């Protein structure tokens, strides 16, 4: 089958590298891809959020399966776009629906989802410009470090962990009032800091059954010794000893 992988990062390169080993793959395309993917697939210039362009590529290249790497097109509803288009509805697309993508696209949505279904999570509250003074009071009720999370997507950089209360209040205003992360931080989730190891659990599902993949740990900090701001992720290890 002909496969289209959307994205331009190391994640997409790793996905294409694995797909290229399968006997089921004929030609693999990457949109837009990168230097590494060009060695394994055919790169196509374009924006992963240009759904009409993606449709054109899928039709012209006789694509049977689309794998969506980045979060942005998922949150904007690329799965729904395919399923509602008669020319694309039978193309296999590996991505969640727009509603399911809200778990990644909105931290406030995710927190409310966890509360509704009794999934353990840190103590938290969501604030906007309208109730920012209440946010100050909530911060004062907590012990450091203080965790501020932009509600929307921010390329992995929207979470701040701060030790100082005054700095936390300052950064809160920078996020909400000054739009430090654009529209993504017009709403901010303040939550309790949890000590421990962060792990990612991956599950593939078709809506009827599911298959779990190995756990992994991200190393997101940009600086040496796990310091500095978060990135989308520098590297990731599969972990068995946890």
List the model feature ranges, each with a label:
Residues 12, 51-54, 75, 79, ...:
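A general structural signal for well-ordered alpha-helical segments in protein cores
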Residues 38-41, 102-108, 223-225:
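Short, charged, surface-exposed secondary-structure boundary motifs
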Residues 57, 137-138, 171:
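CheY-like receiver
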Residues 88-158:
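A conserved helix-loop-beta module that forms one wall/lid of the active-site cleft
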Residues 162-242:
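Internal nucleotide-binding/catalytic subdomain
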């Amino acid at each position: 089958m002909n496969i289209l992988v959307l994205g331009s990062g190391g994640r997409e390169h790793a996905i294409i590298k694995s797909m290229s080993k399968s006997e089921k793959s004929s030609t693999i395309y990457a949109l837009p891809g990168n230097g590494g993917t060009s060695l394994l697939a055919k790169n196509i210039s374009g924006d992963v959020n240009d759904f009409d362009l993606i449709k054109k590529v899928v039709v012209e290249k006789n694509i049977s399966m689309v794998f969506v790497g980045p979060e942005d097109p998922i949150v904007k509803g690329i799965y729904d776009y395919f399923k509602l288009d008669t020319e694309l509805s039978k193309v296999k697309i590996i991505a969640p629906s727009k509603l399911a993508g809200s778990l990644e696209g909105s931290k406030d949505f995710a927190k409310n989802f966890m509360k509704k279904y009794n999934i353990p999570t840190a103590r938290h509250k969501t604030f906007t410009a309208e109730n920012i003074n209440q946010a100050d009071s909530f911060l004062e009720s907590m012990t450091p470090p203080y965790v501020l999370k932009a509600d929307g997507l921010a390329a992995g950089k929207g979470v701040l962990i701060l030790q100082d209360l005054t700095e936390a209040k300052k950064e809160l205003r920078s996020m909400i009032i000054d739009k430090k992360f654009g529209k993504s931080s017009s709403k901010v989730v303040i939550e309790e800091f949890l000590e421990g190891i962060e792990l990612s659990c991956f599950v593939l599902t078709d809506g009827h059954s599911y298959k779990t993949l190995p756990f992994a740990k991200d190393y997101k900090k940009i600086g040496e010794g796990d310091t500095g701001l978060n990135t989308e992720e520098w590297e990731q290890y599969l972990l068995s000893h946890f």
